[in-house]
C-alpha cells in the first residue's frame, strides 16, 4: 500500500521523466513495445499509451508487461480495447504495477479493472492506492481457528457448512442457479454480517451486474443518501471486456478486500462470479503470448495462476477474508482442468445439479456431491454431524433404488425400502427453499432458516414422525413448522374439492 499525494489517475503516478517506448506491433489486445537500450520495464509494470487516433479522438490505454522478448522489446496485454492504436505511438512506462484505490473511498462504488469508477458518481479519492500484484501472507501470519459461517440456507448449513475465513466454491453448468445462489448469499450474509463485502464480477453478464447493483441499492447494502455508509465495493470486468481486463479484475477486487483485512483489521466477504472466466481469460492471453497449450487447450501455467490468486484469499491474525466463488463447469464435467484445479483450494464445495434443477428443486444443490472440511463432529457437534450423515445415507439409498423403481416400480420394494424412499423424497423437497432474491420470479417470500431449526426439521423427517404428511407439503418452505402448516392447508383444500 502507498499514499499518493498526487496522482494523475488511478494507479498511474506523475508520468514525467518516465521511460518512453514506441509500439512496434499490435496483435488484437497484445502490443509489442520497443524501449531504448537499458531502459526496459519490469514484468507486470503498467504501460500507458496516450495520443489521438486518425479521427482525432483521445486515446488512453493501459497495458501490463507480460514478457521481455529481447532486442529491447516487451510484450504487453491491454486492459481496454486497442481500437485506434497505431505503430510508432509513444508508450510511457509508469515504473510500477497497476495500482487501484483502496479503503473507505471504494465503498458503494463500481470500478473497472484499473480502479476507475464507472458509475457516473464522480471521482474517487485516490490518495491511498495498492498494487494489484503482491505476495500471499506468510505462514506465521495465518489464522487457523475453525468456526462455522451460518448462511440461512438449509442444504448448505446442514450438509456442506461454510468456514468463517474459508474459501467456498459454487460449482455448476450453465443455467442451474450459481448467480442466484451467490446473490442470495450476499443478501443473507452481507446484511447479517455487518462487515464489508467486495464483489468481483469476472467475465459474466453485464445485465446481472446491473441487477445486483440495483438490488443492493434497494436493500440498503449500498446507501445512496450517504455513500460512505455502504457495505460493499463492486469491481466489474464483464464478458465484453478484453481478456487482459478479465484476467486481472479478480486481483483488483482482491486487493481492495486485502486492505480492509490488513489495514482496517476487518472480516471481509469476497464474492467472485465467476472464477472460471479468470481461467478462461488466462487461456486467451496465454495463446496470444504464443505459449504452447496444455490439457484441453488450457494455459500451461493454469495451476500457478490459480494459486497466485487463491493463496492471497486467506485469514490472518489481523482479519479474515471469507471468499465465495462461483465456478462454471464446462459441459457439466467436474474433471475439466479448470474446475478440478479450483477444487484443490476450497474448504467447502457446493455442487449444483442439473437433474435437481430439472425437477424444480431450488437451490439445486446436490446433497451427495457437495462437501465441506467443516463437517466433523469436533467442529459442528455430534447432533449436527449425525443428522447430516443420516440425510446423506437416506439420499444415497434412494439414488441406488431409482433404477429398480424405474424398471419394476416401487411396489416391488421391501417395506423398509419403501419407507426410505418416501422419507428421501420428503428430504429432497425439504432441501428446497424460497429465496429472497427470487421473490420477484416465484411470488413466494424468501426464508432464512437458522441452523438449529434446520437440524430439528430433518430429525423429525428421519424419525418418522412426519411419515403421514404428503411430500408436496415439504416443497419450497422454510422451517418444518411451515411444512406441517402447508400439509394442513393441502388437507383442507382436498376436502373442499370433494
Curated annotation (Swiss-Prot):
It catalyses: ATP + H2O + 4 H(+)(in) = ADP + phosphate + 5 H(+)(out). The keyword Transport applies. Keywords: ATP synthesis, ATP-binding, CF(1), Chloroplast, Hydrogen ion transport, Ion transport, Membrane, Nucleotide-binding, Plastid, Thylakoid, Translocase, Transport. It comes from the Eukaryota. ATP binds at residues 172-179. One of its GO terms (biological process) is proton motive force-driven mitochondrial ATP synthesis. Its EC number is 7.1.2.2. It is found in: Plastid, Chloroplast thylakoid membrane. Pfam families: ATP-synt_ab (PF00006), ATP-synt_ab_N (PF02874), ATP-synt_VA_C (PF22919). F-type ATPases have 2 components, CF(1) - the catalytic core - and CF(0) - the membrane proton channel. CF(1) has five subunits: alpha(3), beta(3), gamma(1), delta(1), epsilon(1). CF(0) has four main subunits: a(1), b(1), b'(1) and c(9-12). Produces ATP from ADP in the presence of a proton gradient across the membrane. The catalytic sites are hosted primarily by the beta subunits. Belongs to the ATPase alpha/beta chains family. PANTHER family: ATP SYNTHASE, ATP SYNTHASE SUBUNIT BETA, MITOCHONDRIAL. This is ATP synthase subunit beta, chloroplastic. It comes from Drimys granadensis. The lineage of its organism: Eukaryota, Viridiplantae, Streptophyta, Embryophyta, Tracheophyta. The gene is atpB.
Amino acid at each position: 500500500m502507498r499514499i499518493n499525494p498526487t496522482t494523475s489517475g488511478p494507479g498511474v503516478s506523475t508520468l514525467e521523466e518516465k521511460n518512453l517506448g514506441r509500439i512496434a506491433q499490435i496483435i488484437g489486445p497484445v502490443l509489442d513495445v520497443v524501449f531504448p537500450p537499458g531502459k526496459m520495464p519490469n514484468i507486470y509494470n503498467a504501460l500507458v499509451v496516450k495520443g489521438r487516433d486518425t479521427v482525432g479522438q483521445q486515446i488512453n490505454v493501459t497495458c501490463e508487461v507480460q514478457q521481455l522478448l529481447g532486442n529491447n522489446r516487451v510484450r504487453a496485454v491491454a486492459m481496454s480495447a486497442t481500437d485506434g492504436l497505431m505503430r510508432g505511438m509513444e508508450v510511457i512506462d509508469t515504473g510500477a504495477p497497476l495500482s487501484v484505490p483502496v479503503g473507505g473511498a471504494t465503498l458503494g462504488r463500481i470500478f473497472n479493472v484499473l480502479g476507475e469508477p464507472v458509475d457516473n458518481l464522480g471521482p474517487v479519492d485516490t490518495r491511498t492506492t495498492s498494487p494489484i500484484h503482491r505476495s500471499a501472507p506468510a505462514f506465521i501470519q495465518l489464522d487457523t481457528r475453525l468456526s462455522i459461517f451460518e448462511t440461512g440456507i438449509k442444504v448448505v448449513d446442514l450438509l456442506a457448512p461454510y468456514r468463517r475465513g474459508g474459501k467456498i466454491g459454487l460449482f455448476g453448468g450453465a443455467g442451474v442457479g450459481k448467480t442466484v445462489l451467490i446473490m442470495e448469499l450476499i443478501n443473507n450474509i452481507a446484511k447479517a454480517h455487518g462487515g464489508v463485502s467486495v464483489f468481483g464480477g469476472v467475465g459474466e453478464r453485464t445485465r446481472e451486474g446491473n441487477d445486483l447493483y440495483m438490488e443492493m441499492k434497494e436493500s440498503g447494502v449500498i446507501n445512496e443518501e450517504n455513500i460512505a455508509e455502504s457495505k460493499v465495493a463492486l469491481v466489474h470486468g464483464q464478458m465484453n471486456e478484453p481478456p487482459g481486463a478479465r484476467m486481472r479484475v479478480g486481483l483488483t477486487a482482491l486487493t481492495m478486500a486485502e486492505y480492509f483485512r490488513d489495514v482496517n483489521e476487518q472480516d471481509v466477504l469476497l464474492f467472485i462470479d465467476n472464477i472460471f472466466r479468470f481461467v478462461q481469460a488466462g487461456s486467451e492471453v496465454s495463446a496470444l503470448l504464443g505459449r504452447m497449450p496444455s490439457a484441453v487447450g488450457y494455459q500451461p501455467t493454469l495451476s500457478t495462476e490459480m494459486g497466485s490468486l487463491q493463496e492471497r484469499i486467506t485469514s490472518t491474525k489481523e482479519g479474515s477474508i471469507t471468499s465465495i466463488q462461483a465456478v462454471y463447469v464446462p459441459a457439466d464435467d467436474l474433471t475439466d482442468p479448470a474446475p478440478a484445479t479450483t477444487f484443490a483450494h476450497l474448504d467447502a464445495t457446493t455442487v449444483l445439479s442439473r437433474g435437481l434443477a430439472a425437477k424444480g428443486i431450488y437451490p439445486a444443490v446436490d446433497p451427495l456431491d457437495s462437501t465441506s472440511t467443516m463437517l466433523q463432529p469436533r467442529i459442528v457437534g455430534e447432533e449436527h454431524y449425525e443428522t447430516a450423515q443420516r440425510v446423506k445415507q437416506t439420499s444415497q439409498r434412494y439414488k441406488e433404488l431409482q433404477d429398480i423403481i424405474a424398471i419394476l416400480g416401487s411396489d416391488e420394494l421391501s417395506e423398509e425400502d419403501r419407507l426410505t424412499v418416501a422419507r428421501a423424497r420428503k428430504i429432497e423437497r425439504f432441501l428446497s427453499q424460497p429465496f429472497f432474491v427470487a421473490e420477484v420470479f416465484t411470488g413466494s417470500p424468501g426464508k432464512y432458516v437458522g441452523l438449529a431449526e434446520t437440524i430439528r426439521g430433518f430429525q423429525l423427517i428421519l424419525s418418522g414422525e412426519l411419515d403421514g404428511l404428503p411430500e408436496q407439503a415439504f416443497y419450497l418452505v422454510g422451517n418444518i413448522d411451515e411444512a406441517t402448516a402447508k400439509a394442513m392447508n393441502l388437507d383442507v383444500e382436498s376436502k373442499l374439492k370433494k
